[in-house]
């Protein structure tokens, strides 16, 4: 029912609440839906359904709401581990985040951890909601907490001095007890989110990229590669590059077909077959990508932020050490890589999230924020994201 009433003529933005346990993320989510969406009570959001992303089970609650300017899809996770998994797997892509900090406690360990994760996985912007301000009588104390939050954000390379911080009480909003710190604060928060979190560039406006899933030879016509266009547009007659695994080559797309029909272009979201000029059936393979020339480079060495599954989640039963050699599943293929642990880290236990250095045995078309699964013999044992490219 709720699906029908959202008009799609507004820009769509994906956001989520992050922050320390019990600082009020779920209450705030409920309060936002009260004024901007179809009201969802705290316990409706807290009973988050489980879903699978890259072979990992995550509990996530999804709500949607809209301001006069935008339509929002909002994710809230019940447990800390769910946040870690969610942000690393990209199960719920975030264009921005609302960091919830209790004014009574100030920044806590998970506050720091979520900011670090947001930095590592490339969340573009953060807005802060200083919650539970009714529990703090001293204005100076409130100012101190705000300063602390700004310094913490700056220490992780977010613009701490410029980030909007809105003070209020999610509970007051839910209980209609104090309009100023309740409803008014929630409306002020959403105005800040509207203004400060940038509208994401639509996939269709980005440079063309398509992971190759399959390769066919069609007699008399040449080689066709199939896959789902990840972003951008490819037009018949355009020059494109084949990147990854082998040296980069240029070719021309001489045909695009979808559902057995010939088209003059393929665009983000389309499952297409692309006919490639002068490419031998053996000259291209699954795991490579087609892309706009010069837009993506192949790389072997990168720093990754990774989450390692627990035994209960179907992961490893034992820790791993430096020189661990699993497969890294990028887009459509597995590539073996050698893992180097950070200095001072002797081993990584199942359930840890960790920053590691990886060197692949062959180069893969790679950009920062590219996500991957870590596998051993086809079984997923972890998930990760490229935090930065080394070479």
From Swiss-Prot:
Principal subcellular localization: cytoplasm
G3: region residues: 76-79
Highest taxon of source: Bacteria
Residues annotated as binding GTP: 19-26, 76-80, 131-134
Chain spans, region G4: 131-134
Keyword Membrane among record annotations: no
GO cellular component annotations of the record: cytosol
Keyword vocabulary terms for this entry: Cytoplasm, Elongation factor, GTP-binding, Hydrolase, Magnesium, Metal-binding, Nucleotide-binding, Protein biosynthesis
Entry EC no(s): 3.6.5.3
SUPFAM superfamilies: EF-Tu/eEF-1alpha/eIF2-gamma C-terminal domain, P-loop containing nucleoside triphosphate hydrolases, Translation proteins
The protein's role, per its UniProt record: GTP hydrolase that promotes the GTP-dependent binding of aminoacyl-tRNA to the A-site of ribosomes during protein biosynthesis.
PANTHER family: ELONGATION FACTOR TU, MITOCHONDRIAL, ELONGATION FACTOR TU-RELATED
Family: Belongs to the TRAFAC class translation factor GTPase superfamily. Classic translation factor GTPase family. EF-Tu/EF-1A subfamily.
Name of the molecule in the record: Elongation factor Tu
Lineage: Bacteria, Pseudomonadati, Pseudomonadota, Alphaproteobacteria, Hyphomicrobiales
């Amino acid at each position: 029912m709720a699906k029908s009433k959202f008009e799609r003529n507004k820009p769509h933005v994906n956001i989520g609440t992050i922050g320390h346990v019990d600082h009020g993320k779920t209450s705030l989510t409920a309060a936002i839906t009260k004024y901007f969406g179809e009201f969802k009570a705290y316990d409706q959001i807290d009973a988050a359904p489980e879903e699978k992303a890259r072979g990992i089970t995550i509990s996530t609650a999804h709500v949607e709401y809209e301001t006069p300017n935008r339509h929002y899809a909002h994710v809230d996770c019940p447990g800390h581990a769910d946040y870690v998994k969610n942000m690393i797997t990209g199960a719920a892509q975030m264009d921005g985040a609302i960091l919830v900090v209790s004014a009574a406690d100030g920044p806590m360990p998970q506050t720091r951890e979520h900011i670090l994760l947001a930095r590592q996985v490339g969340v573009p912007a953060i807005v802060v909601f200083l919650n539970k301000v009714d529990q703090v009588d001293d204005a100076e104390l409130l100012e101190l907490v705000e300063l602390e939050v700004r310094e913490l954000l700056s220490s992780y390379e977010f613009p701490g001095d410029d980030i909007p911080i809105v003070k209020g009480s999610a509970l007051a909003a839910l209980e209609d007890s104090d309009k100023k710190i309740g409803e008014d604060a929630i409306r002020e928060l959403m105005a800040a989110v509207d203004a400060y979190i940038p509208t994401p560039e639509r996939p269709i406006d980005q440079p063309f990229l398509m992971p190759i899933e399959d390769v066919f030879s069609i007699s008399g016509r040449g080689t066709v590669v199939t896959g789902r266009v990840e972003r951008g547009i490819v037009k018949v007659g355009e020059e494109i590059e084949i990147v990854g695994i082998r040296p980069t080559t240029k070719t021309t797309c001489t045909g695009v077909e979808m559902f057995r029909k010939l088209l003059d272009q393929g665009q983000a979201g389309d499952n297409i077959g692309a006919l490639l000029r002068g490419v031998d059936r053996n000259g291209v393979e699954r795991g490579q990508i087609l892309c706009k020339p010069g837009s993506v480079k192949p790389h072997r060495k990168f720093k990754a932020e990774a989450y390692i599954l627990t035994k209960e989640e179907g992961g490893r039963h034992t820790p791993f050490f430096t020189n661990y050699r699993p497969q890294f599943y990028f887009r459509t293929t597995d590539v073996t890589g050698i893992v180097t642990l950070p200095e001072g880290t002797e081993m990584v236990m199942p359930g840890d999230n960790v920053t590691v250095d990886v060197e692949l045995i062959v180069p893969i078309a790679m950009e920062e924020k590219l996500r991957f699964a870590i596998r051993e013999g086809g079984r997923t044992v972890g998930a990760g994201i490229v935090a930065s490219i080394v070479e």
